């Protein structure tokens, strides 16, 4: 009788979280992880900070080596091994190694943690040297090597999402003339009102040229290297280095070919136990959908924290956890540093709330981060989204301090399905160095008849 084996496809956040949780659940289970690249167990979110020089070297992002998993946890790690085909009915995965050798691996249970891939539009000139995406460790390795060899002077970033904003700061830290080109009329598409305006002001105040409402159509070269970025209106921007940050897509090709159900978002459909539509096949991380607790809809939310937590659930259940582990879903909480600004959001934007069918409203409030008499306080701008019953639907904040942690209070309120008047009754911490007597959260949620 063949021994039970858990096979995990993908060796970064969700995949290794699944493998480790499976080991905690079943100490004697055979566990193997296959990873198509040469890198595992690293914090990709830190890549812009290595590019900027804040973090000294790429290796600082590596959390554990393959030997750690093999020797400390008896988890087999197979690098440079690409999954080619999943055969759920036969409990087999066909793989190919670097040497082009093909073989079949048996599984009792399978966890898919194939992640997401950076979108690189097939624009003219996208193959020129100096045009990059930044998603995986080897992307950072290539980009750093290019900077060291070519010594670029001017950088263009295509897209004003999270990676675009972080890379703007990284390139300015290196002294590059930096331009962000965004096809929509605002940065970070889900930010509304004055919150997004503050981000643009900060970028421009740091000598980043921000070009909104312009679509990039081509990259022009000098020889085999990028030299200019051209927009639909005919404008051209000098660039010796370009980062394309227009988003990512779920890496689901192998799952789709195996007949697994794919949702409207393009990601793998999973339930609260991280089970897919195929027996004994689980999925976790950026390749799968999850429940949005505010809208009640299945969404694709590719961020590290949900990926790890989904990995824990998938790994536990794939290893036979009793009772079954469950993933409670997301409310969509995240934060980004934009030079001196902290920018954070949770829940739905006004547009997302309206699309989800809510009769949604929004309002903004600005208040101090500390007591008025305490030195070095700054202004925090808060935008809250709610429905006509007063139910909180989302929040966005921007300021130079005290934002990234305060947003978690709103996230907790969303998890509890609270109304803004209930949130306004919270007993929050106060001391002059940390908050005014009435915290920005309480000011933003106060009844309209209060001063």
List each language-model region with its residue ranges.
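Short hydrophobic core segments
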Residues: 9, 83, 105-115, 158, ...
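A conserved FAD-binding loop/helix module that cradles the flavin
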Residues: 270, 284-349, 434-451
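FAD-site-proximal beta/loop scaffold in flavoenzymes
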Residues: 127-150, 221, 225-230, 236-316, ...
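Beta1-alpha1 glycine-rich phosphate/pyrophosphate-binding loop at the start
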Residues: 2-75, 168-191
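Glycine-rich dinucleotide-binding loop and its adjacent helix/turn
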Residues: 109-174, 209, 264, 270-272
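Flexible, glycine-rich terminal cap/loop adjacent to redox cofactors
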Residues: 2-4, 9-13, 17, 23-28, ...
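A Rossmann-like FAD-binding core segment of flavoenzymes
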Residues: 28, 72, 77-98, 105, ...
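Rossmann-like dinucleotide-binding cores of NAD(P)H-dependent redox enzymes
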Residues: 61-62, 154-155, 162-218, 303-307, ...
């Amino acid at each position: 009788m063949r021994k039970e084996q858990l096979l995990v496809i993908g060796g970064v956040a969700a995949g290794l979280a699944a493998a480790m949780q499976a080991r905690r659940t079943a100490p004697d289970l055979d566990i193997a992880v296959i990873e198509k690249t040469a890198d595992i167990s690293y914090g990709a979110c830190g890549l812009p900070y290595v590019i900027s020089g804040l973090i000294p070297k790429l290796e600082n992002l590596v959390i554990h080596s393959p030997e750690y998993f093999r020797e400390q946890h008896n988890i087999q790690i197979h690098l440079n091994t690409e999954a080619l085909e999943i055969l759920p009915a036969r409990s087999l995965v066909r793989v190919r190694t670097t040497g082009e050798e093909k073989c079949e691996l048996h599984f009792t249970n399978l966890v898919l943690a194939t992640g997401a891939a950076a979108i690189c539009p097939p624009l003219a000139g996208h193959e020129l040297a100096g045009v990059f995406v930044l998603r995986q460790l080897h992307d950072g390795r290539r980009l750093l090597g290019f900077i060291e060899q070519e010594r670029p002077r001017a950088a263009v970033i295509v897209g004003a999402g999270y990676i675009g904003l972080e890379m703007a700061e990284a390139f300015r830290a290196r002294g590059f003339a930096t331009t962000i080109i965004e096809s929509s009329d605002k940065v970070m598409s889900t930010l509304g009102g004055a919150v997004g305006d503050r981000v643009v002001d900060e970028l421009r105040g740091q000598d980043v040229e921000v070009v909104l409402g312009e679509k990039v159509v081509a990259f022009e070269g000098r020889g085999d290297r990028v030299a200019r970025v051209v927009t639909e209106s005919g404008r051209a921007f000098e660039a010796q280095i370009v980062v394309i940050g227009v988003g990512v897509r779920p890496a689901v090709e192998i799952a789709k070919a195996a007949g697994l159900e794919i949702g409207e978002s393009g990601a793998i459909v999973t339930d609260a136990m991280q089970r897919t539509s195929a027996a004994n096949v689980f999925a976790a991380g950026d390749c799968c959908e999850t429940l949005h607790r505010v809208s009640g809809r299945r969404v694709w939310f590719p961020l590290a924290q949900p990926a790890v937590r989904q990995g824990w659930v998938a790994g536990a259940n794939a290893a036979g956890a009793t009772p079954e582990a469950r993933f409670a879903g997301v409310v969509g909480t995240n934060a980004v540093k934009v030079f001196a600004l902290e920018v954070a959001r949770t829940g739905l934007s006004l547009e997302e709330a309206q699309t989800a069918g809510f009769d949604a409203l929004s309002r903004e409030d600005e208040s101090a981060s500390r007591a008025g008499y305490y030195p070095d306080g700054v202004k925090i701008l808060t935008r809250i989204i709610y429905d006509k019953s007063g139910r909180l639907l989302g929040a966005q904040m921007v300021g130079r301090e005290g934002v990234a942690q305060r947003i978690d209070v709103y996230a907790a309120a969303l998890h509890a399905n609270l109304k803004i008047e209930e949130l306004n009754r919270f007993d929050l911490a106060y001391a002059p160095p940390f908050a005014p007597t009435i915290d920005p959260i309480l000011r933003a949620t106060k009844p309209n008849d209060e001063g």
